[in-house]
Amino acid sequence: MTTLPTLPPLPEDIVTGMEELKIVMSAALERQRSQLVQSRQDVNRVLKELEEESKGVSLEIESHMARQHDLRLQISELDKQIEDSKGTIVEYSRRRSELESKVEAAQRACDEGRQRLEEQQSLRRRQVQHVMEQSVRNVPELMYMEDLLGMKIEAVQDDQLRFVFVKLDPNDYAREFAFVLDMADVNYRVEQLEPTLDLSVVDRVVGKLNSSRNFPQFLKEIRQAFKDAIME
């Protein structure tokens, strides 16, 4: 039987070099992995800032927040890929870049929504100011309306009006039933109810106002809610 020749051992300097190369490559891979984890944390931080800035703006902005939630799910999937050593650094970087672009687009959409909201608020303030100026010129007419309808409107501060009803309580026609309407945001809010009403009733009436913008119907229903409370 023919005996195969034995290969000579590698020179010691080559063996040493290969070991050093393994160490260097391991360190480089660990640094890259740490950078990926840091990048993920940076993306999450940006998303968190977006979420904080977008609170209480409008339904349109909420839809963008839902989009951000979807992006978080995608980032979570990337996290699993990092932990399981799946995928490549190039692919992760590409997908991360795509997510950053989408986050920036969501931010721009939020900024645009916020700008439109500010414009609407500015317009509403001008409208309120016009009403107040007109009311000064029409004091006799207002006094007549107050006496006829048993309702008056008082300016509280910017973006807030106080509505006062009388002639509701058959035992005390002078008794006042009042609330403050806050118009600072896109959706109206009712505050400082005197006397207090059932919260579910108020939410229902205000919800209809915000969806229909039918202000006369709103006044009719909130007045009726006060009358119903007297009978309870």
From Swiss-Prot:
Residues 27-126 form a coiled coil. The gene is SPC25. Belongs to the SPC25 family. The lineage of its organism: Eukaryota, Fungi, Dikarya, Ascomycota, Saccharomycotina. This is Probable kinetochore protein SPC25. It is found in: Nucleus; Chromosome, Centromere, Kinetochore. Component of the NDC80 complex, which consists of NDC80, NUF2, SPC24 and SPC25. Its main location: nucleus. It comes from Yarrowia lipolytica (strain CLIB 122 / E 150) (Yeast). Keywords: Cell cycle, Cell division, Centromere, Chromosome, Coiled coil, Kinetochore, Mitosis, Nucleus.
